[in-house]
Design a protein with these regions (language model features):
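Long amphipathic alpha-helical segments
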Residues: 1-66
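Short glycine/serine/threonine-rich phosphate/pyrophosphate-binding segments
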Residues: 32, 96-101, 125, 145-155, ...
Length: 219
């Protein structure tokens, strides 16, 4: 393969605070294999690598990757020790866990331990309020929800920490593949809510990393 087809941005984490990641969707098995080979002894995060695409990779490429089918992420180069981050991830429903896991795996790749609090959507509000003392201990919260996305405003109205909203494509009918949840997040009456694109767990993790880094490095 002509290596001009891709250029890995190894300097990205130093420059921006967010590690380089390979968006695997749309790439061929040969392209992914060449990227993994080019990474050699370095660490690399791959996102949106479906189980079907993972199975098409050459055996030696698959063997080199720590693959998580739920989040469709893979890590080359193994894990690193995780430090407490103060970042919590709140998933409205079990069906939102793939996106929540993408955020968690991205943060783990960057060396940050997170906690996922799952199935606390507002259809059973007691599930959320029962965990409110725990939620208020986090420095940053990532909220993941589909359907109507009501979790975003409710959570952001209960905690001091910044909340990053991730609408998911979970739902049907007028949920419109996550658009209803996205519009709900954007129209939220809870001030300070940060919103990323539909199903963008990686983007939410990137926002959290920047917040964390800014809080540590600046007075």
């Amino acid at each position: 393969m002509d290596f001009a087809e891709f250029q890995i941005d190894w300097d990205r984490e130093r420059r921006t605070g967010v590690p380089e990641a390979i968006f695997s969707q749309g790439k061929t098995a040969a392209q992914i294999g060449a990227i993994v080979a080019a990474a050699a002894d370095r660490r690399l995060l791959l996102t949106r690598l479906s189980a079907v695409a993972h199975e098409t990779l050459a055996p030696e490429v698959r063997d080199a990757l720590d693959y998580d089918p739920l989040s469709a992420t893979a890590v080359l180069g193994g894990g690193i020790p995780l430090a407490a981050s103060g970042i919590g991830i709140v998933a409205a429903g079990t069906s939102d866990l793939p996106v929540a896991r993408e955020a968690a795996r991205t943060l783990a790749f960057a060396g940050h331990r997170t906690e996922i609090i799952a199935d606390v959507g507002v259809a059973g509000l007691w599930r959320l309020t029962a965990r409110i003392d725990t939620l208020r201990q986090f420095r940053i919260l990532i909220a993941v929800a589909g359907m109507e996305g009501a979790l975003f405003s409710v959570l952001a109205g209960l905690v001091e920490a910044p909340v990053v909203a991730v609408p998911t494509s979970v739902g049907y009918g007028v949920a419109e593949g996550g658009r209803a949840a996205l519009h709900s997040a954007l129209a939220s009456c809870a001030p300070g809510l940060v919103v990323v694109n539909i199903d963008n767990g990686f983007g939410a993790a990137a926002a959290a990393l920047k917040m964390l880094r800014a809080g540590r490095e600046r007075p």
